[in-house]
Design a protein with these regions (language model features):
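Glycosyltransferase-associated regions of secretory-pathway enzymes
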Residues: 1-172, 187-349
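Small-residue hinge/turn detector
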Residues: 172-184
């Protein structure tokens, strides 16, 4: 097969085995993480090691952001957005240099808030190492990723955590560093394994009737699965109470679908979920998550590759280049406003 975008004939590219490691990342308070999905991955992929990446000293990133935002919101200030950005700039310039010398982020957060008389909620309780051992996870420190050639990425990581409180972007940095340095498969903590194969009777009915599965329909199938394994805690009532109108069905069709789902799930066990098995990628490339119905659309909630992949290295290099561009244009600490073609430079708080 020839890949036109890359100009590569993939049939001639060597395929390499991916290390048997599943990587999960959590940034923030570990008390808030829901491990239900990770547990499912672990139980259905017993040949894989579970690496749980966690920044032990950054559990107060949410506390810092919320404290500053609440502090500004009660002040009689005309431009609250600008005031919030200014305090966050001070926070970064106070916290980050000290982190570089070995101080704890969490301790510096409390120190900064106290020094500036910014009220904050009680910090969450500390997590013991037993938390990881009891779940069979191998504890890995995010900070170890910022060594040698990757020390600049530590600065970018804290830009996202302190200045923008953009945990998703911080996680993007971390997941790429993990895959490049370790290889294996990165998975978002809110991503399930492929489960559609367990719906034998339902899927046969869908094909027969020519039903197009909407996002609501797919979500309904997932909710039913989660209810079956008693992991539905916290799901919104609107999802659990889904009706035929949301699925684009009439009442009769909806009842039939519920009946078939019940039949499919009657004898369900986790053994029915297909394991990843041995995973291969083309040399120096990577595999990404995708949905069958979205041709050419890929997602970074699932990334798999071997160590030192050139493709991942290129992505990291481009990321570094863009952060440096923003630094040169003074767009890290300033609120850049431009309604023209360069509006992507605008800092988002």
């Amino acid at each position: 097969m020839s890949h036109q975008a890359l100009g590569i004939d993939l049939s001639k590219v060597e395929r390499l085995s991916v290390p048997n490691i599943l990587h999960f990342v959590w940034i923030g308070d570990l008390n808030e993480v829901n491990t239900h999905y990770i547990d499912i991955w672990e139980k259905t992929n017993k040949d894989k090691q579970i690496f749980f990446w966690y920044d032990q000293n950054s559990s107060l990133c949410h506390l810092l952001n919320n404290a500053i935002r609440d502090f500004v919101s009660v002040k009689k200030i005309k431009n609250k957005v600008k005031a919030e950005l200014k305090i966050k700039n001070h926070a970064f310039k106070y916290i980050y240099p000290k982190i570089k010398t070995g101080f704890s982020f969490d301790e510096l957060v409390i120190e900064f808030l106290t020094k500036h008389e910014i009220p904050y909620q009680r910090p969450p309780k500390a997590i013991e190492d037993a938390w990881f051992g009891n779940r069979g996870f191998i504890k890995k420190s995010i900070t170890e990723l910022f060594c040698n050639d990757f020390d600049d990425f530590m600065r970018y990581y804290y830009y996202e955590i302190i200045l923008r409180h953009n945990i998703a972007s911080a996680s993007d940095i971390v997941r790429l560093l993990i895959i490049y340095q370790y290889g294996g498969t990165y998975i978002d903590v809110d991503t399930l394994p492929y489960i559609d194969n367990i719906y034998h009777k339902l899927n046969e009915y869908i094909r027969k009737e020519g039903i197009v599965e909407s996002d609501s329909f797919l979500l309904f199938k997932t909710v039913c699965f989660l209810k079956k394994i008693n992991s539905e805690g916290g799901l919104p009532e609107a999802v659990i109470g889904c009706d035929e109108n949301e699925l684009g069905l009439d009442a009769v069709g909806f009842e039939e679908i519920k009946r078939l789902i019940e039949l499919d799930l009657t004898d369900f066990s986790l053994d029915m979920i297909l394991p990843l098995g041995e995973t291969y990628v083309h040399k120096n490339l990577l595999a990404l998550g995708s949905l069958r119905r979205f041709k050419g659309v890929y997602f970074n909630n699932f990334i798999s590759s071997h160590q030192k992949s050139k493709a991942v290295r290129i992505i990291l290099r481009v990321m570094k280049k863009r952060y440096r561009f923003l630094e040169r244009k003074n767009c890290i600490f300033d609120c850049y406003i431009d309604d023209g073609s360069r509006c992507y430079l605008t800092r988002r708080s």
